Amino acid sequence: MIIFPAVDIQNGKAVRLKQGRAHESTVFAESPVDAARAWEEAGARWLHVVDLDGAFDGAAQSRRIVRDICAALAIPVQLGGGIRDMHTAEAYLEAGVSRLIIGTLALEQPTLFADMCRAFPGRVGVSLDAEGGRLKSRGWVEDTGMTVDTALPRLLDDGAAFVIYTDIERDGMQCGVNVAALEHLARLSTVPVIAAGGVATLEDIQKLYPLTLETSLMGAVSGRALYEGTLDLKEANAWIDARKNTPESA
């Protein structure tokens, strides 16, 4: 199981939102690069970066910052937010991003998403962001009318290499994870699934861990909880590592 610390970029700073609302942001670091370095030093094995300006505006806004983050780290980076054409996808991969997270484009332009998956095999995943069971797009402000059950089969057929599932109502609220929804998705999916939204404490990691042994769940993104200290990255990684060689993990 991998824990992905989140660095969300808005107006050049590292922030966290509540339930994806752009006007409810908390600045946690003036420099996203410094925040990224701090998570690597704390033991992060992957970094999860989101260009929030790109997600809301529909165009890549933070390419220079993302490039600087990738150059500063030895660990791989996955990136989402504002990737809505092939040129932007290619530019971010050339900048050092290991894999891309596609949301709006995957739901609204299936042919282009499939082309992107073919062009960059194994490096393009999909973000499924749900509120009340329905998937949202365009920075979580538009209701697509789709659900996980209706959207996932086509996205897998298109070539999605992994899935990130965000429970919007729990994102940034530190209220715990929606284990039932995650388990449902992780049993449907044939590619790795990453949980996001509400991962707030070591107890949440402990609730999710059994699913990594039984389903396609492979990790969890956490942001505000790591910044505010309700989840300690070193402690969580140590807890996971202690179970790698136990009988239940064999």
From Swiss-Prot:
Entry keyword Lyase: no
Keyword Coiled coil: no
Localisation per UniProt entry: Cytoplasm
InterPro entries recorded: Aldolase_TIM (IPR013785), His_biosynth (IPR006062), HisA_bact_arch (IPR006063), Isoase_HisA-like (IPR044524), Isoase_HisA-like_bact (IPR023016), RibuloseP-bd_barrel (IPR011060)
Enzyme Commission designation: 5.3.1.16
Catalyzed chemical reaction(s): 1-(5-phospho-beta-D-ribosyl)-5-[(5-phospho-beta-D-ribosylamino)methylideneamino]imidazole-4-carboxamide = 5-[(5-phospho-1-deoxy-D-ribulos-1-ylimino)methylamino]-1-(5-phospho-beta-D-ribosyl)imidazole-4-carboxamide
GO molecular function ontology, one term from the record: 1-(5-phosphoribosyl)-5-[(5-phosphoribosylamino)methylideneamino]imidazole-4-carboxamide isomerase activity
Any single Gene Ontology cellular-component annotation: cytoplasm
Active-site annotation: D8, D129
Organism superkingdom: Bacteria
EC primary class: isomerase
GO BP term, example: L-histidine biosynthetic process
Keyword tags: Amino-acid biosynthesis, Cytoplasm, Histidine biosynthesis, Isomerase
Pfam family, one: His_biosynth
Family: Belongs to the HisA/HisF family.
Matches recorded under PANTHER family: 1-(5-PHOSPHORIBOSYL)-5-[(5-PHOSPHORIBOSYLAMINO)METHYLIDENEAMINO] IMIDAZOLE-4-CARBOXAMIDE ISOMERASE (PTHR43090:SF2)
HAMAP family given in the database record: HisA
Protein known as: 1-(5-phosphoribosyl)-5-[(5-phosphoribosylamino)methylideneamino] imidazole-4-carboxamide isomerase
Taxonomic lineage: Bacteria, Pseudomonadati, Thermodesulfobacteriota, Desulfovibrionia, Desulfovibrionales
